[in-house]
A protein has these predicted regions:
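H-loop (His-switch) and adjacent beta-strand-loop-beta switch element
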Residues: 192-202
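ABC family nucleotide-binding domain
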Residues: 1-188, 192
Length: 202
């Protein structure tokens, strides 16, 4: 399996086929039992756990079905955490002001400019998922990995979230890999990968 920079790739298959497992392997959240994950010429599976964490935090953004927002922190604070961790990983001092400005700007782009001080319990499902997407983007990753990002949203909100992801791909030239069971979503991807009986089909 090879994925090029700037592609939108949908991974589809029946429940339990291994879609999420493949996504987790691509993002080095899981280790493959065989084979390798090559990113920009580097075999990620051969790196130390710390180096994998460095690359994962700075180069990959993750969006999950559940928002996984920290309930005691505001939308802005939730978005900031990966950025501040990333600044340490890359050897820079935590540039809090710079990351805060970027986070506020990104939240504004998705219609949450007036919600930055709200905690997750004060946000709707769609707003929480938008916060989760912006959190995934705070380090300007080259790859966005989405696991059923609309799975827990109503149809209208789900479409809005997908439009956001497609627009980010266009404006930022990010590679997007999205796991979905929805064939309508898959139709909007540039390429569809099917997992059947443990095999990858295109």
């Amino acid at each position: 399996l090879s994925i090029e920079q700037g592609e939108i790739v949908a991974i589809v298959g029946v429940s339990g086929a291994g879609k999420s497992t493949l996504l987790h392997i691509l993002g080095i959240l899981d280790t493959p039992t065989a084979g390798s994950v090559i990113y920009k010429g580097i075999n990620l599976t051969q790196l130390s756990a710390k180096k994998q964490a460095d690359i994962r935090n700075l180069n990959f953004g993750f969006v999950f079905p559940f928002y996984n927002l920290l309930p005691d922190f505001t939308a802005l604070e939730n978005v900031l955490f990966p950025g501040l961790i990333g600044s340490r990983f890359s050897g820079r001092k935590a540039a809090t002001k710079s990351y805060t400005e970027r986070a506020i700007s990104l939240l504004g782009r998705v219609g949450l400019g007036d919600r930055v001080t709200h905690k997750p319990s004060q946000l709707s499902g769609g707003e929480r998922q938008r916060v989760a997407i912006i959190r995934a983007l705070i380090n300007n990753p080259e790859v966005l990995l989405c696991d059923e990002p609309t799975g827990n949203l109503d149809t209208k909100t789900g479409h809005e979230i997908l439009e956001l992801i497609w627009n980010l791909n266009t404006t930022l030239n990010q590679t997007v890999v999205i796991v979905t069971h929805d064939e309508e979503i898959a139709k909007h991807a540039g390429r569809v990968i099917r997992i059947v009986d443990g095999c990858i089909l295109e």
